[in-house]
C-alpha cells in the first residue's frame, strides 16, 4: 500500500489523458489531487454514446469544473485502437508544439482494454527524454460489485441529487496509484521515417530510387512548375546534364507534380532529408551515380532491413519501393 501511495505522490502536475469508460473517480481524482495542468478526456461522439456514457461524462465534467481543472473533450471511436492512438498522438504533438517539454500521464485504468493498449503503445513509441509519457493504473477503494444494497442505494441518491445521474460507476474512491514504466521502442532515425511516409503516400505504385533521390535535391525544394528554367536546373542536378531538351522538361514537370503531391504540406520534413543528404554529400564526391547509390544504401537497404518496405521490384530499368504492412503500422503510430 505504501508503494502505491508513493506512486501517487510521484505524479506532479502534467498533462493527463484518459479514455472514458463507466468510471468517474478513477478519472477525476488523480488529476484533482495532483494538480494536473490539463486533462484530455477521450470519449465517444455524443450521437454514438449510450445514455450511461453521456451521464458519466457529465459527472466527470462537473467534478473538473467544481475543482477548476482545465479539461478538453476529444472524441474517438473507443472500439478502434488506431483511432484512439491517433487522438493520443495528436494531443501529445499539440502539447509539445505549444509548450515544449511537457510531462504526460496516461490513465490506463479508466476505459476498456483497447484504451489501455493505446496508452501503453503511445508511451513506448512517443516517449522523449525531456517529455516523458508515463501510464498509471488507479486502484479504487471500492468496487460496485463489492457494495451492499444499502451502500448502493445511498450512493445512487448522492449521484442523483448532486450530479443528476441515475447510474453508478464501476468503482469509487482511490486506494492508490501504480505507475507503469513500459520499455521504450528504438525507432529508425527521423529522416528514414520521413522517406517511409513519402513512400507510403505513393500507394501501390511506390517510388523509384531515382524519385527518392530527387526528393533529396534542393532544386526540387525550389522548383516552380510554372518556370521551365527551374525545371531545367532540377534536371541538371539530377542527371548531371548541361543541355536539357524540351521533352525532358515536360517529362520532369509531370514527375515533379506527382512528387509534390506525395510531399503535400510536409515541406519542413522535405528540408530535413535534403539537409541529411547535404551533410553526407560533403564527405563524398557528388555524381549522378553516387546519389542513387547513397539512397539505395542509406534509405532503401535500411528500411528493408527493418522490414518497413517490401523487397524492391524491378520494372524495366527502375526499382520500385513500396511500403510494407509493418511500415504502415509503424507510420500509424508515429507518422
Swiss-Prot record:
InterPro entries registered for this protein in UniProt: HFX_2341-like_N
The organism of origin for this protein: Methanocaldococcus jannaschii (strain ATCC 43067 / DSM 2661 / JAL-1 / JCM 10045 / NBRC 100440)
Protein name, as recorded: Uncharacterized protein MJ1513
Domain of life: Archaea
Amino acid at each position: 500500500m505504501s508503494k502505491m501511495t508513493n506512486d501517487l505522490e510521484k505524479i506532479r502536475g502534467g498533462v493527463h489523458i484518459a479514455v472514458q469508460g463507466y468510471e468517474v473517480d478513477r478519472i477525476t481524482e488523480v488529476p484533482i489531487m495532483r494538480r494536473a495542468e490539463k486533462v484530455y478526456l477521450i470519449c465517444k461522439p455524443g450521437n454514438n454514446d449510450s445514455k450511461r456514457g453521456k451521464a458519466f461524462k457529465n459527472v466527470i465534467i462537473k467534478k473538473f469544473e467544481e475543482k477548476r481543472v482545465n479539461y478538453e473533450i476529444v472524441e474517438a471511436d473507443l472500439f478502434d485502437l488506431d483511432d484512439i492512438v491517433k487522438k493520443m498522438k495528436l494531443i501529445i504533438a499539440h502539447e509539445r508544439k505549444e509548450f515544449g517539454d511537457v510531462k504526460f500521464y496516461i490513465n490506463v485504468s479508466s476505459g476498456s482494454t483497447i484504451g489501455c493498449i493505446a496508452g501503453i503503445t503511445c508511451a513506448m513509441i512517443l516517449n522523449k527524454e525531456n517529455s516523458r509519457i508515463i501510464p498509471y493504473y488507479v486502484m479504487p477503494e471500492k468496487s460496485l460489485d463489492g457494495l451492499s444494497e444499502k451502500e448502493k442505494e445511498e450512493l445512487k441518491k448522492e449521484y442523483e441529487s448532486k450530479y443528476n445521474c441515475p447510474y453508478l460507476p464501476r468503482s469509487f474512491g482511490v486506494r492508490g496509484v501504480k505507475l507503469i514504466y513500459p520499455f521504450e521502442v528504438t525507432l529508425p532515425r527521423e529522416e528514414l521515417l520521413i522517406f517511409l511516409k513519402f513512400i507510403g503516400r505513393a500507394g501501390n505504385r511506390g517510388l523509384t530510387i531515382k524519385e527518392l533521390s530527387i526528393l533529396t535535391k534542393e532544386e526540387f525544394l525550389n522548383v516552380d512548375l510554372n518556370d521551365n528554367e527551374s525545371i531545367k536546373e532540377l534536371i541538371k542536378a539530377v542527371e548531371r546534364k548541361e543541355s536539357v531538351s524540351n521533352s525532358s522538361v515536360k517529362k520532369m514537370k509531370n514527375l515533379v507534380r506527382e512528387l509534390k503531391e506525395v510531399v503535400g504540406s510536409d515541406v519542413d520534413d522535405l528540408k530535413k532529408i535534403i539537409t541529411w543528404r547535404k551533410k553526407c554529400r560533403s564527405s563524398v564526391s557528388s555524381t549522378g551515380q553516387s546519389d542513387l547509390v547513397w539512397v539505395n544504401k542509406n534509405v532503401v537497404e535500411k528500411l528493408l532491413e527493418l522490414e518497413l518496405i517490401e523487397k524492391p521490384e524491378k520494372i524495366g530499368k527502375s526499382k520500385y519501393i513500396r511500403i510494407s504492412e509493418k511500415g504502415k503500422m509503424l507510420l500509424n503510430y508515429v507518422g
